[in-house]
UniProtKB/Swiss-Prot annotation:
It comes from Escherichia coli O17:K52:H18 (strain UMN026 / ExPEC). Its cofactor is pyridoxal 5'-phosphate. The modification N6-(pyridoxal phosphate)lysine is found at residue 229. GO terms for biological process: glycine biosynthetic process from serine; tetrahydrofolate interconversion. (6S)-5,6,7,8-tetrahydrofolate binds at residues 121, 125-127, 355-357. It comes from the Bacteria. Belongs to the SHMT family. Catalyzes the reversible interconversion of serine and glycine with tetrahydrofolate (THF) serving as the one-carbon carrier. This reaction serves as the major source of one-carbon groups required for the biosynthesis of purines, thymidylate, methionine, and other important biomolecules. Also exhibits THF-independent aldolase activity toward beta-hydroxyamino acids, producing glycine and aldehydes, via a retro-aldol mechanism. Its EC number is 2.1.2.1. Homodimer. The record marks 228 as: Plays an important role in substrate specificity. This is Serine hydroxymethyltransferase.
Length: 417
């Protein structure tokens, strides 16, 4: 018989120890990976609920199993909130991840071998936008577009490529681009050749929800996002659309289930519903505004200290530090900062001479530090510490000194108070 008092700590000490160590790591390390964030205890409560027990293949009101009357309410809440938050008239909250949401869009709109225009991974794109190691690069004919010498999307080249290759779909969106995308311009280019415009806004969804970054939903045929990252919800995916046909929406639904997934994760969908409600609160807008301010503050320090920032700045939550001129690799920088309890990720920079496993840059994002309560002053102080480490990358005394400062500020700004 199952009892409420059953717990992991008393049953599986080895697993519990790893879980507790991760909790301590999160509290004692500064998180600057742009795709990571801290979700609320309400979201975690939803994910640890009895909803995890329920199979619910299908969609609200059209399930293949009985006993779905309450999970139907949960999923419909998530759908309605997603539509309201992003100004959409269609939402599918079932994708288990952003990549699976993207897979569903490809499946719904394309046939294998169709031509797709996607942002070059080396210029800030994502694996699912056409990388040869991903399903998107294996199943479709990918034509990459990129950024110009200033570090911004080269719309003239994008338009030229579109007219030359006549893709069936153009992908907007990124995993490491710090500028503002002109969604209207991308739709104009797509319309000029009769292509779909598909936008993956996974990185900026929270900023979009708060009105800090332009909303692609009115411009794109289909939009996907993750529900974590800047949106600060559970790990999962979401598909949105506005002004499309019922036929398109049916195709998208069918591409998710049964096309790519079986039963939805109802406990995660409940977490999405909570996070979407949280994103409608006034404090969420204030939070996202601070995310952008903190990113700009950090860039300012890196530039003052003589570091090159791709595109010269940032208009969202992330930026790339180009270490080529410093004769450092991203791998070295990542490791040294990690020893100081500062977590970043190595990242390729435009025209990177190093392999993706080594790279010549680091990607820095501010959603997680802002969630802890950091403002511009703390963000600038942190950027200065990072420069200290990078300036003395082989000096363990410097790294230990910065680690002490990190532990102190983490204690003052806990993740969960």
């Amino acid at each position: 018989m199952l009892k409420r008092e059953m717990n992991i700590a008393d049953y599986d000490a080895e697993l519990w120890q790893a879980m507790e160590q991760e909790k301590v790591r999160q509290e004692e390390h500064i998180e600057l990976i742009a795709s990571e964030n801290y979700t609320s205890p309400r979201v975690m409560q939803a994910q640890g609920s009895q909803l995890t027990n329920k199979y619910a293949e299908g969609y609200p009101g059209k399930r293949y199993y009985g006993g779905c009357e309450y999970v139907d309410i949960v999923e419909q809440l998530a759908i309605d909130r997603a539509k309201e938050l992003f100004g959409a008239d269609y939402a599918n909250v079932q994708p288990h991840s952003g990549s699976q949401a993207n897979f569903a869009v490809y499946t719904a709109l394309l046939e294998p071998g169709d031509t797709v225009l996607g942002m070059n991974l080396a210029h800030g794109g994502h694996l699912t936008h056409g990388s040869p190691v991903n399903f998107s690069g294996k199943l479709y004919n990918i034509v990459p577009y990129g950024i110009d010498a200033s570090g911004h999307i080269d719309y003239a080249d994008l338009e030229k490529q579109a007219k030359e290759h006549k893709p069936k779909m153009i992908i907007g969106g990124f995993s490491a681009y710090s500028g503002v995308v002109d969604w209207a311009k991308m739709r104009e280019i797509a319309d000029s050749i009769g292509a779909y415009l598909f936008v993956d806004m996974a990185h900026v969804a929270g900023l979009v929800a708060a009105g800090v970054y332009p909303n692609p939903v009115p411009h794109a045929h289909v939009v996907t996002t993750t529900t974590h990252k800047t949106l600060a919800g559970p790990r999962g995916g979401l598909i949105l659309a506005k002004g499309g046909s019922e036929e398109l929406y049916k195709k998208l639904n069918s591409a998710v289930f049964p096309g790519g997934q079986g039963g939805p994760l109802m406990h995660v969908i409940a977490g999405k519903a909570v996070a979407l409600k949280e994103a409608m609160e006034p404090e969420f807008k204030t939070y996202q505004q601070q995310v952008a301010k903190n990113a700009k503050a950090m860039v300012e320090v890196f530039l003052e200290r003589g570091y090159k920032v791709v595109s010269g700045g940032t208009d969202n939550h992330l930026f790339l530090v180009d270490l080529v001129d410093k004769n450092l690799t991203g791998k070295e920088a990542d490791a040294a900062l990690g020893r100081a309890n500062i977590t970043v990720n190595k990242n390729s920079v435009p025209n990177d001479p190093k392999s993706p496993f080594v790279t010549s840059g680091i990607r820095v994002g501010t959603p997680a530090i802002t969630r802890r309560g950091f403002k511009e002053a703390e963000a600038k102080e942190l950027a200065g510490w990072m420069c200290d480490v990078l300036d003395s990358i082989n000096d363990e005394a410097v790294i230990e000194r910065i680690k002490g400062k990190v532990l102190d500020i983490c204690a003052r700004y806990p993740v969960y108070a």
